Amino acid sequence: MRKLFTSESVTEGHPDKICDQISDAVLDAILDKDPNGRVACETAVTTGMVMVMGEISTKCYVDIPKLVRETIRGIGYDRAKYGFDCETCSVITSIDEQSVDIAMGVDEALESKKGEMDKLDAVGAGDQGMMFGFATNETKEYMPMPIEMAHKLSRRLSEVRKNGTLPYLRPDGKTQVTVEYENGKPVRIDAIVISTQHGPEIYLEQIEKDIKEHVIKVIVPSELLDENTKYFINPTGRFVVGGPQGDSGLTGRKIIVDTYGGYGRHGGGAFSGKDPTKVDRSAAYAARWVAKNLVAAGVADKLEIQLAYAIGVAKPVSISVDTFGTGKMTDEEIVSIVNKVFDLRPGAIIRDLDLRRPIYKQVAAYGHFGRTDIDVPWERLDKVEEIKKHI
């Protein structure tokens, strides 16, 4: 049976991704000085303006406007002709402390109040909600091919802009990849869409030629392309006005880009700007860690795990697994292995993945999962042998 599946990615200069990176830059700066700081930082950008808001409880001081300008400069918006300039944009901040009602549930979990606890039971989940983790062995990164390929193309767009290969490119851009599957396995790429911001002096014909030569051919294995593969490069014909001048942006608007490109489910909670007591982030990272190690151990070819939490309660209220018919054992048996090998209380996740560190801005663009260019703890295959003992 054949089917097509499509996923998209965006570059670091996309307005929503600018916001994610600013929010995580603030988080990293606080965790660097105060590992126990509580952060929920949201950012909005529009023409000539950045607004940073949220709830932050910390003992340290960070210069938020300076962080904002440094982040925007690093992305590449460093001159007025780009329509957004790190030096001249206004930066507005509105920061409150974390609600005492939320803090009391995180500081002392329900298990602690009832006296049924060890030390890790003392940290309650920062919110209710459900989080999903996913892994598949169809790529070496244990990620679905459509999102993995889209991210690589987006990263390459930024690379050729910054290293001067294509100096007329500007920071904003999007990619989209359609993969054809046969009997559940990726066999070819059916379509590639790339929209990249550019200077007004360049013509579409040159952009199409350069993107095929310096981006697509460098990233996509030739065996996945054929004479029927379709290419759509700047299909509107012109993309000069971009970034916050073209569209306003908000933190948390690219949650599917951040995860599995729609191939796996999403619980709805965004990641960026949130410290690890927020299970939206830490439990989603843990779920990916669990799923990847299970697939690498040979438990299934494809696996999705759902975790669910109640605010102020340490232990997950539910854990469920779906192997889509690829499991080497029942889903119930896999859940039993998960409970034996992994401790999924928020305090244990923070400990085991060492999450109270400034490691978040680096994943705020080009995906939080499947990253081989950086070392992030939830991508480590450190539980495979222990899982195999229970198979």
Curated annotation (Swiss-Prot):
Residues annotated for Mg(2+) binding in this entry: D16
Positions bound to K(+): E42
Keywords: ATP-binding, Cytoplasm, Magnesium, Metal-binding, Nucleotide-binding, One-carbon metabolism, Potassium, Transferase
Signal sequence, renumbered to the chain: none
Cofactor(s) the record lists: Mg(2+); K(+)
Pfam families in alphabetical order: S-AdoMet_synt_C, S-AdoMet_synt_M, S-AdoMet_synt_N
Family to which this protein belongs: Belongs to the AdoMet synthase family.
Family matches, as HAMAP family: S_AdoMet_synth1
PANTHER family, alphabetized: S-ADENOSYLMETHIONINE SYNTHETASE
Protein name: S-adenosylmethionine synthase
Gene this protein is translated from: metK
